[in-house]
């Protein structure tokens, strides 16, 4: 009995040549992430995403150093241990430590650093982005947890500063 187990097209070959550094999983598929909040249906959403082999879930909130985010991370790691979790956003070493202790695989740093963001004003919480990155990295590097600098990137030099401050990546 003969079965078709795969199909490669000229377009597939061209994409591999054009994008040799594309981020792919062990099966050669592009990696996929999805953002969820911490509303009452977060677990159902995360399970549905895990069932379709999403690579990472991002718990995306304006202020990640909160009980709801920490409890969501703990619950997700307990119920879907294979799921990679990025959580944030935090602006302090303490917030970073709380998320790491809860079980995150990566921390997003930056509260209200974006040009159009009003989170600092509305929530009354925020730290200058470079300071937030350095404080988070000081804690995260002890546990070998990556840090994503999120926001405050208006000029190309801002990317260099975020990386120089220790962020593993920027968004």
Language model segments and positions:
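Alpha/beta enzyme core
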Residues: 1-171
């Amino acid at each position: 009995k003969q079965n078709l187990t795969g199909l490669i097209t000229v377009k597939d070959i061209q994409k591999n040549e054009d994008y040799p550094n594309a981020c792919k999983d062990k099966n050669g598929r592009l990696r996929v992430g999805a953002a969820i909040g911490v509303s009452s249906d977060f677990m159902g959403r995360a399970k549905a995403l895990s069932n379709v082999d999403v690579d990472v879930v991002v718990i995306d909130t304006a202020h990640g150093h909160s009980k709801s985010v920490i409890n969501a991370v703990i619950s997700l790691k307990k119920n879907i241990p294979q799921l990679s979790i990025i959580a944030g956003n935090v602006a302090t070493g303490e917030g970073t430590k709380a998320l790491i202790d809860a079980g995150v695989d990566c921390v997003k740093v930056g509260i209200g650093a974006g040009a159009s963001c009003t989170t600092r004003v509305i929530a009354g919480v925020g730290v200058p982005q470079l300071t937030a990155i350095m404080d988070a990295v000081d804690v995260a590097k002890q546990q070998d947890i990556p840090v994503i600098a999120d926001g405050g990137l208006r000029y190309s030099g801002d990317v260099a500063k975020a990386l120089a401050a220790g962020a593993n990546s920027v968004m």
